[in-house]
UniProtKB/Swiss-Prot annotation:
It is an enzyme of class 1 (oxidoreductase). Pathway: Polyol metabolism; myo-inositol degradation into acetyl-CoA; acetyl-CoA from myo-inositol: step 7/7. The keyword DNA repair does not apply. NAD(+) binds at F155, K179, E182, R183, S232, E387. Keywords: NAD, Oxidoreductase. It comes from Bacillus cereus (strain ZK / E33L). PROSITE patterns: ALDEHYDE_DEHYDR_CYS. This is Malonate-semialdehyde dehydrogenase 2.
Length: 488
């Protein structure tokens, strides 16, 4: 007899304890490759948020006074535990997010790198001094934590993005309340378990699962001093406005429409390889995905042919299968939304040279859309204007680098942009005139390492201090200035 087991119910992590939510409302967590329900996540309430913030605030009293080297040693141990559990974490990402195991494995690496950066807290927290600002007078600047931090993270990087946030925040002496995506809560829970194993005190890291009520609870709570958010543009704008209205520091990383410019002198083999990976990796569900390729007319036919040829070789399927490159999108409604954009591109006159809709019906119950490529796209089309967040690539033909930059700069998004060329002069012009925060030269995904800021512009970011790097340290700390007079 086969015994049917119910999907696990995800609990909140508050004050070092795994507790059930006050809410009885649940949302299913699916494996997007199979459509199978793998868990039930609570849609927690503001009461749950209150409990988590209270626990974090109480823990802040002692954690903020903990010696910085001791905080760093806990993070070093945490980093080693992440390394020791690397394969398990990657598999869990693939199961609840859908991306290929190889990509999930790489995501774990990026998360580990973030913890490594945060473990440098003794250096990161250093202040500055000037011994002689006047006769017998000296001044010094000291960094201090700011209190309870709220973090709201998306489904597309369930390990990397939380690791952008809470390791650096707690390294700086703050305590943290994390609201992971309700679509991918399992990885966040595992991160908390390993943090506890590393010796992180109770209440320093808390997790409240849910949706709108949890977000609003964090944005409105007086004891939450800052909010770090990653997600879609409309929600990012909402979080920034509501958070700042409640006098909080806010960094809100939003949507993207990243342009890749291919010039006549580009290495087309390299450009093709990089664009395919950047456009279709993680099923296009990342804010640094290559969404638009702007190519000079003389080489456009060659590039389009190469891209279609390589896209046809992509293996689509369950990310746990060894040869799979392209997994599913996150949910069935996102699959239908993507198909709607493909339909729109056809209706508005773009040339569909590779139709990913043809790959949706042969993969069983999962939420699959194949690599899709449009040629002869114009900036009036929705597929050029909107963040689709799916494996859909638009190709725009131009006469010059000037025209390519002009078109890219008309986008309201400005996360990343890339150029493929062997010309130093073209690279310099691109660097100086493109309106985008993260640039790549002959690379497809110019996402910076954890020790540099993730620096989107325009409607790709709301705030003053970006995630990661010294911007992150500034965001999670406040300063005291001490001026002293010492006379004999």
């Amino acid at each position: 007899m086969t015994v049917q087991t119910a999907p696990q119910i995800v609990k909140n992590y508050i004050g070092g304890e795994w507790v059930e939510s006050i809410s009885t409302k649940m949302e299913a967590v699916y494996n997007p490759a199979t459509g199978e329900v793998i868990a039930q996540v609570p849609l927690s309430t503001k009461v749950d948020v209150e409990q988590a913030v209270s626990a974090a605030n109480e823990a802040f009293k002692s954690w903020s006074k903990t010696a910085v080297p001791k905080r760093a040693r806990i993070l070093f141990k945490y980093q080693q535990l992440l390394v020791d559990n690397w394969e398990e974490l990657a598999k869990l990402i693939t199961i609840e997010n859908g991306k290929s195991y190889n990509e999930a494995y790489g995501e774990v690496l990026r998360g580990i790198e973030c913890v490594e950066f945060a473990a440098g807290a003794p250096t990161l927290m250093m202040g500055k001094q000037l011994p002689d600002i006047a006769t017998g007078i000296e001044s010094g600047m000291y960094r201090y934590p700011i209190g309870v931090i709220g973090g709201i993270t998306p489904f597309n990087f369930p390990m990397m993005v939380p690791c952008w946030m809470f390791p650096l925040a707690i390294a700086c002496g703050n305590t943290f309340v994390l609201k992971p995506s309700e679509r991918t809560p399992l990885l966040a829970a595992r991160l908390a378990e390993l943090a506890e194993e590393a010796g992180l005190p109770k209440g320093v890291l808390n997790i409240v699962n849910g949706a709108h009520d949890v977000v609003n609870g964090l944005l409105e709570h007086k004891l939450v001093k800052a909010i770090s958010f990653v997600g879609s543009q409309p929600v990012a704008e909402y979080v920034y406005k509501k958070g700042t209205e409640n006098l909080k520091r806010v960094q809100a990383l939003a949507g993207a429409k990243n342009h890749s410019i291919v010039l006549n002198d580009a290495n087309l083999e390299l450009a093709t390889k990089q664009i395919i990976s950047a456009a279709f990796g993680s099923a296009g569900e990342r804010c640094m995905a290559a969404s638009v390729v702007t190519v000079e007319e003389e080489i456009a036919d060659q590039l389009v042919g190469r891209l279609v040829e390589e896209a046809n070789k992509i293996v689509i399927g369950n990310g746990l299968d060894e040869d799979v490159f392209l997994g599913p999108v996150i949910r069935d409604n996102h699959k239908e939304r993507t198909i709607g954009y493909i339909d729109s591109g056809v209706e508005q006159g773009a040339t569909l040279v590779r139709d990913g809709r043809e790959d949706t019906a042969v993969k069983g119950a999962g939420y699959f859309v194949g690599p899709t490529i449009f040629d002869h796209v114009t900036k009036e089309m929705k597929i050029w204007q909107d963040e689709i967040f799916a494996p859909v690539l638009s190709i725009v033909r131009v006469k010059s680098l000037d025209e390519a930059i002009e078109i890219a700069n008309e986008s309201r998004f400005a996360n990343g942009a890339c150029i493929y060329t062997d010309s130093g002069a073209s690279v310099r012009q691109f660097r100086e005139t493109i309106e985008s925060g993260m640039l790549g030269v002959n690379v497809g995904v110019p996402a910076p390492m954890a020790f540099f800021p993730f620096s989107g512009w325009k409607d790709s970011f709301y705030g003053d201090l970006h995630a990661n790097g010294t911007d992150g340290v500034e965001f999670y700390t406040r300063k005291k200035m001490l001026t002293s007079r010492w006379e004999k």
